[in-house]
A protein has these predicted regions:
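Sec-dependent N-terminal signal peptides of Gram-positive bacterial secreted proteins and lipoproteins
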Residues: 1-17
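A residue-level marker of the well-folded mature domains of exported/periplasmic proteins
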Residues: 17-352
Length: 352
């Protein structure tokens, strides 16, 4: 009897010890206003909890001060690992200095956090490849290799938020592919707005993009019966949706719609691809990225090295950040069913 009681006491003590040692993971997402961040947050929370971690998931409404405050609270509450998709990649140094002093490990999620040596690892997609996929699509479908400067294709360019480090890779990858055709006169941007700064959109705002596209249409005289516009480069889907809204309002239809690129395969953009008002999107399966982060968290919690496949690309100003890059995939009207529906990413009813 005494032996049995001792065994029970020992078991209870073990369970209690396990509970007190449960690792707390803080997950800080930038906003709930974009579909992809909801999916990222939900996927991570579900997988981390299934792996036995306590998860504190917070969304910051694209408010830098709010995100900073939420991270401060995570540190106060004893979170020992932070996963952060920063609103502004350069705005978190102060709070992350505190994290480093407390021995908290920091994983930058999809957006690299700049100028902080507290960042331990980075998990993202191959963002340069995202841009090259978009650029290559335009080269192929505008038939730029077959054109001459006497018959150029006309394009306007849009990218994302200037405080998001990823735009250097999205935009840079696309421009690297397109630059030879700009240089030879085979590809022309009538507005002359081709620099990253000129094409950037604060907070990836659909509304701001729509306004800029409307202004370009008015200034350049674009339209089905007006000046020719063959394509609009867009770094992601929230940007593409603003472009599409403006072009539809200007009278374009699926029969004469300029080629509009995108990224994320957001539901509205998939619907636009089906309708012929967006040409393509780069699919980044957030389930894959979330699963990779869970592996990284698990390795950190167990004191081992997490899986890394890039130690050259991402320098945040304090040095190269060891990274894991997931593969982006091309998507359009021809393959969205196998890519998104058959894989279980969406239900068919989501995009009907």
């Amino acid at each position: 009897l005494f032996l049995s009681l001792a065994m029970v006491a020992s078991a209870l003590s073990f369970v209690s010890c396990n509970k007190t040692k449960q690792v707390k993971v803080g997950v800080s997402m930038p906003t709930k206003s974009l579909q992809r961040w909801n999916q990222d947050g939900d996927n991570m929370k579900k997988e981390l909890e299934a792996a036995g971690y306590f998860v504190d998931l917070q969304y910051a409404n694209n408010d830098i001060a709010q995100q900073t405050s939420q991270i401060e609270n995570m540190l106060t509450q004893g979170d020992s690992i932070l996963v952060i998709a920063a609103i502004d990649g350069s705005a978190l140094k102060g709070v992350l200095d505190t994290a480093k002093k407390q021995g908290v490990k920091v994983i930058a999620y999809d957006r690299l956090i700049m100028n902080s040596d507290a960042v331990t690892y980075y998990a993202t997609f191959d963002n340069y490849k995202v841009g090259t996929i978009q650029g290559t699509y335009l080269v192929d479908n505008l038939k730029l290799k077959e054109r001459t400067a006497d018959d150029p294709a006309y394009i306007e360019l849009f990218t994302g938020s200037p405080d998001d480090n990823n735009i250097h890779f999205f935009f840079g990858g696309a421009v690297d592919v397109l630059k030879p055709y700009f240089d030879s006169g085979v590809l022309v941007c009538p507005s002359g707005q081709t620099s990253e700064a000129q094409c950037a959109t604060l907070n990836w705002s659909t509304e701001a993009v729509q306004k800029r596209m409307e202004n370009l249409i008015a200034a350049q005289g674009y339209g089905p019966a007006g000046k020719k516009l063959d394509a609009v480069y867009s770094s992601n889907d929230s940007v593409a949706q603003g472009i599409t809204n403006a072009l539809v309002a200007a009278g374009y239809t699926a029969a004469n719609f300029p080629l509009v690129t995108g990224q994320d395969c957001d539901k509205p953009s998939v619907k636009n691809m089906i309708a012929g008002t967006q040409a393509m999107s780069v699919f980044k399966d957030t389930r894959t990225l979330a699963s990779q982060v869970v592996k990284m968290v698990d390795a950190i919690a167990k004191g081992s090295e997490p899986p890394i496949n890039d130690t050259k690309t991402y320098d945040n100003g304090t040095g190269i950040i060891p990274s894991f890059l997931c593969e982006p995939v091309y998507g359009d009207k021809s393959n969205y069913k196998s890519l998104l529906i058959d894989s279980g990413y969406y239900k068919a009813s989501d995009i009907e």
